């Protein structure tokens, strides 16, 4: 039995069954739908203050301080129940050390106190999405999330409840008035159509932290078509889980088109990184689009690049929590056929064949 040192000031929780196994995670559902995952096989101490989680200390003496978020509930998840987590025994030299960013969808975190990790979730459906927010730029670096049978439904309509993200300090967040008269749409990264299991889940996609200023023709054109393609991959015949990153370029001067009069940074490119796991096998693809007001090709293969190439263009390490051997293999190759990407000609032929079969 691994001994867990827990400090309780006024909160009492029984962890007897968990401490006997000392593996898996404790998932804390915190106030305002935030979650925090504690990795038990590295845990040294959990500190509480009243009914709030305050600090996690691990056996390597790293500490993670939580800003006194009130605990709504705690769930224990055994290793076998954590979907698609790589083995702790696998060699992984570039993984995120923050347990909050240990799932496969997370890119490598950018260091520095001005880069915030924000997570939105619901108790019923788990993590809605996570994002990295650059306070110095007041901009989203990336949004990431998973798609699988348990968190993608068709229960709710679009809510359109655009609002500020109060998890970001007031001085560093974007506000609704910045988009008014800017000439840009509030472009979703995690789209509302990907999160329709519940009203709260759908509403969470409308935080401005999940937006980038986007030309409407791009937003309703090529970006929307690529979003639809991702949802087409989200079926049990193709995947067990999709790990999705959606983002726009904010880090390099030559990949920024400028700023609006209200101070919104205008990305020059939008992109996606998709990892698919099916029956224990992985494949990955990058999708890269120029952000402009022109009409873009309907041939999705023109946007497809390898993850290695996407990393070269962005400077971001995607899917860093995979074991190194798997990461190196899947990120270096691009198999268009495996992703079943149709050219416009193939799409028309598919529609005609479908119609003839139903006549």
Label each residue range with its predicted role.
Residues 21-38:
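Short N-terminal segments immediately surrounding and downstream of signal-peptide cleavage
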């Amino acid at each position: 039995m691994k001994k867990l040192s827990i400090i309780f000031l006024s909160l009492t929780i029984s962890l007897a069954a968990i401490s006997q196994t000392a593996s898996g995670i404790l998932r804390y559902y915190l106030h305002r739908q935030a979650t925090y995952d504690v990795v038990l096989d590295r845990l040294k101490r959990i500190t509480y203050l009243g009914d709030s989680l305050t600090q996690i200390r691990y056996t390597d003496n790293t500490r993670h301080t939580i800003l006194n978020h009130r605990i709504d509930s705690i769930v224990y998840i055994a290793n076998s129940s954590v979907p698609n987590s790589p083995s702790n025994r696998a060699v992984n030299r570039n993984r995120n050390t923050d347990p909050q960013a240990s799932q496969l969808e997370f890119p490598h975190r950018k260091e520095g106190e001005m880069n915030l990790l924000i997570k939105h979730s619901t108790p019923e459906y788990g993590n809605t999405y996570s994002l990295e927010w650059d306070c110095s730029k007041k901009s989203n670096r990336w949004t990431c999330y998973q798609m699988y049978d348990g968190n993608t439904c068709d229960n709710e309509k679009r809510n359109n409840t655009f609002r500020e993200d109060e998890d970001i300090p007031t001085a560093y967040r974007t506000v609704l008035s910045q988009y008014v008269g800017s000439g840009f749409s509030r472009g979703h990264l995690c789209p509302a159509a990907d999160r329709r299991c519940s009203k709260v889940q759908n509403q969470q996609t409308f935080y401005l932290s999940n937006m980038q200023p986007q030309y409407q023709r791009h937003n309703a054109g090529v970006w929307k078509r690529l979003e639809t393609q991702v949802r087409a991959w989200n079926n049990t015949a193709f995947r067990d889980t999709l790990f999705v990153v959606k983002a726009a370029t904010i880090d390099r001067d030559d990949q920024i088109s400028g700023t609006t009069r209200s101070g919104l940074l205008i990305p020059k490119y939008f992109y996606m990184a998709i990892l698919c796991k099916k029956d224990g096998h992985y494949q990955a693809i990058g999708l890269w689009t120029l952000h402009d007001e022109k009409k873009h090709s309907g041939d999705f293969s023109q946007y497809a690049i390898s993850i290695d190439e996407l990393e070269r263009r962005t400077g971001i390490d995607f899917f860093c929590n995979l074991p190194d051997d798997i990461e190196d293999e899947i990120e270096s190759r691009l198999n268009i056929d495996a992703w079943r990407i149709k050219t416009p000609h193939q799409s028309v032929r598919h529609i005609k064949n479908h119609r003839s079969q139903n006549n």
